[in-house]
Amino acid sequence: MIKFASFLKFRVQINGGRYWSSSPLRSVSNYVKFVFMDNAFKKYSIDTTDYQVGQDNVQKWGFDIHNPVFGISAGLVVFCLISLLLVEPVTARDALNGIKNGIIEQFDAFFMWSTNFFLLFAVGLLFSPLGKIRLGGKEATPDHSTVSWLSMLFAAGMGIGLLFWSVAEPTAYFTDWWGTPLNAEAYSADAKSLAMGATMFHWGVHGWSIYALVALALAFFAFNKGLPLSLRAAFYPIFGDRAWGWLGHVIDILAVLSTLFGLATSLGLGAQQATSGINHVFGLNGGIGTQMVVIAFVTFIAVLSVVRGIDGGVKLLSNVNMIVAFALLIFITFITFDTAMGSLVDTTMAYIQNIIPLSNPHGREDETWMHGWTVFYWAWWVSWSPFVGMFIARVSKGRTVREFLFAVIVIPTLVTLVWMSVFGGIALDQVVNKVGELGANGLTDISLTLFHVYDVLPYSSVISILSIVLILVFFITSSDSGSLVIDSITAGGKIDAPVPQRIFWACIEGSIAAVMLWVGGKEALQALQSGVVATGLPFTFVLLLMCVSLVKGLRTELSAYR
């Protein structure tokens, strides 16, 4: 026994003197605790995990799929579609609208304060020492030029909404279409200022901070820690190897469904809007047939884009998109210079003056407006964050955290400020001065509001055709980038999924939009949209937890930058 005790002392001292004890049993106990705690620490450390990207994948029929995520996602897509199509579209829309509205009404303060927190958290990271950390490692270099990088993140993050809502949203606020911000009197000077300020509030730094934090977490854990480019990887510092199990499966499946149905909804509703524009400009009377042609065209070009990959497809289209968008913006500014410049100054001041009152959910007299617009917007931004965040992450290797946050939050907000000021300012000017359709009847058909504004401008036909082209390109860039994101998630976080897999998801997006439009019309798409917005609630909890995980991860690399 004495020799055995001496042996224990010797072994325990070798593994660390602080575990030595004169009691043999205590020595054994301490040593066992040491071994198991040390192994547990290694198991849950992002620097020592032995998980390999794609280790759970199955290769078959030219696909490289993560078995549970791909199969369950595909099955749930079919189940959701059949369920929506078997039920009367209006009934499905009303039921899902009820769920969405219940979530918005019960969790309004939670959505508002969470979004405020995301903005403050992002600003804190930007100015903290953690901002020096580079995505991909200290010596990493960017994969894309700054211009192409900004073009891709902006095209994926904004899309068609920038065109339609830049005129429709301020007009709606000014004319009391669904309440007015801060209960301002409709058609008053205060209502005009608040209309522009509130529009920018919904499209500015708050929303982009949501995208930025998701993108930053995904990029850091993928490029700095070698983890899969999937949502689950961002939670490894908290959940350890459980992130690779069913907890992670559920997170990724929710991300796939939210992305897929969100894109399909936008594509379907956008096809209706594009068809309305084509009919208005060319004097046609196209209906569901034209909408199917638009969806088929967008899907076909998106397939070509995803086949060519980031550099040959998505980046090229995004650059073309930005060129066309800036050409349109410059031309509109030139022909309405005085109105545009005056609106830019007024909108900037209105945004700065009202950002705090609009961010506060308590004691509001405009609760109906806040629920119908602000809380809906925050839920929508959050529900889209897995898609947009993952795409931004994929193209952001080589940027520092500080550079990344500034570019993703500030630059798009400044571009949006100029865009909204010009287009929204022109629309409100027409309403105030009783010019054109907006001046005579106000907001009647949202899908045609942009073209109603153009009708009273010089070269209206040229501007309208250019806008239709821009609408289609925005559709394509959203579809192809979304397909690449879904490919990555369902491939177990692999960045380059096989070509057949990319084609599969791009076609599925278009097919869902076409089927929903053909069978259920606008009501079916609105039901799908309400379902997507409802996912904003669980994803908000996920994002709050992601902030904790991100800080834990970033702190492991801070010592290399001191």
Swiss-Prot record:
It comes from the Bacteria. One of its GO terms (molecular function) is transmembrane transporter activity. It is found in: Cell inner membrane. The chain crosses the membrane at residues 68-88, 110-130, 147-167, 203-223, 243-263, 287-307, 322-342, 373-393, 404-424, 456-476, 503-523, 531-551. The keyword Transmembrane applies. Induction: Induced by NaCl upshock. GO terms for biological process: amino acid transport. GO terms for cellular component: plasma membrane. It holds the Pfam family BCCT. It is a multi-pass membrane protein. The keyword Transmembrane helix applies. Its main location: membrane. Keywords: Amino-acid transport, Cell inner membrane, Cell membrane, Membrane, Stress response, Transmembrane, Transmembrane helix, Transport. Belongs to the BCCT transporter (TC 2.A.15) family. Involved in the uptake of osmoprotectants. Can transport glycine betaine, proline, choline and ectoine. This is Glycine betaine/proline/choline/ectoine transporter VP1456.
